[in-house]
Amino acid sequence: MPASLIDGREISALRRTELKQRVQYHVEQGQRAPGLAVVLIGNDPASVIYVSNKRKACEEVGITSHSYDLPAETTQEKLIELINELNQSDKIDGILIQLPLPKHINERTIIEHIKPEKDVDGFHPYNLGRLAQRNPFLRPCTPLGIMNLLHHYELNVKRKHAVVIGASNIVGRPMSLELLLAGATVTICHKFTQQLQKFVEIADFLIVATGKMDVIATDWLREHQVVIDVGMHRLPDGSIRGDIDFKKAVEKVAWITPVPGGVGPMTIVTLLENTMMSAARLRE
């Protein structure tokens, strides 16, 4: 029997509708709409598409998107100057720096210059530290989006074994913290993990964020599992797939996210929700 689909498009649409109503309410009360600064350095095709989608999503819910498109040769010093201006601006509630950055710019340095209360990506050490201490405020968008998906479908991780494949600062590490916060027993696997198959086979929840296709063989999967595929890869024919072979996996597991249409839409709506949360906090 094919797996049940975890539909990120449907759930993100519901959350966007709710968010739009909240934004409209605050505007009707005489408050300005939340403002999100979206900074793009260079013209990497994938980044251009991601930024365009984020700006369209802002427009859809009534959040004001402030665009800053900078040339690829922009220096780290100039970017920090812009961030400092945005940190001080009363019109900006959230700052998003589209990653990856050009090689001459240090991502960690840039992230650390964003005010934690405007760090709507949730990457600042302060925000990650709060998550680790079980007192989160602005949380990384992809892991939180995944948790919201699981909650909607009543897929409870408490007392279950969750295996996270990938240990990036953006997904894998904060994902493990979210799962711990929700009461899961968590195993993190990465490029140095030996006997990866063994860990995959014993997972109740499998979150795959390797950034590479087919690291996880579909014959490792089991019928009771919930599989969350964070990967996104464009194939030569223009189609998009995830880290896992969906057509094979959907016949083997209990629940699975499609790619596209699973995690991606939830990441964007969570970014918008973080911006709204930041705006509310800054007005206090």
UniProtKB/Swiss-Prot annotation:
* Listed pathway(s): One-carbon metabolism; tetrahydrofolate interconversion
Q: Which GO terms describe its biological process?
A: L-histidine biosynthetic process; methionine biosynthetic process; purine nucleotide biosynthetic process; tetrahydrofolate interconversion
Which positions does UniProt annotate for NADP(+) binding? Answer: G166, A167, S168
Q: Keyword NADP on this protein?
A: yes
Q: Which domain of life is it from?
A: Bacteria
Write down the chemical reaction(s) this protein catalyses: (6R)-5,10-methylene-5,6,7,8-tetrahydrofolate + NADP(+) = (6R)-5,10-methenyltetrahydrofolate + NADPH; (6R)-5,10-methenyltetrahydrofolate + H2O = (6R)-10-formyltetrahydrofolate + H(+)
- Gene Ontology terms: cellular component: cytosol
Q: What is its EC number?
A: 1.5.1.5, 3.5.4.9
* Cross-referenced InterPro entries: Aminoacid_DH-like_N_sf, NAD(P)-bd_dom_sf, THF_DH/CycHdrlase, THF_DH/CycHdrlase_cat_dom, THF_DH/CycHdrlase_CS, THF_DH/CycHdrlase_NAD-bd_dom
Q: Name one GO molecular function term.
A: methenyltetrahydrofolate cyclohydrolase activity
Establish whether keyword Amino-acid biosynthesis is in the entry.
Answer: yes
Q: What UniProt keywords apply to this chain's record, in alphabetical order?
A: Amino-acid biosynthesis, Histidine biosynthesis, Hydrolase, Methionine biosynthesis, Multifunctional enzyme, NADP, One-carbon metabolism, Oxidoreductase, Purine biosynthesis
Q: Which NCBIfam families match?
A: PRK10792.1, PRK14186.1
Which purpose does this protein serve, as stated in its record? Catalyzes the oxidation of 5,10-methylenetetrahydrofolate to 5,10-methenyltetrahydrofolate and then the hydrolysis of 5,10-methenyltetrahydrofolate to 10-formyltetrahydrofolate.
Q: Which PANTHER family match?
A: C-1-TETRAHYDROFOLATE SYNTHASE, CYTOPLASMIC (PTHR48099:SF5), C-1-TETRAHYDROFOLATE SYNTHASE, CYTOPLASMIC-RELATED (PTHR48099)
What binding partners and quaternary form does the record give? Homodimer.
By sequence similarity, the record places it as follows: Belongs to the tetrahydrofolate dehydrogenase/cyclohydrolase family.
Instruction: Return the protein name.
Output: Bifunctional protein FolD
Name its species.
Legionella pneumophila (strain Corby)
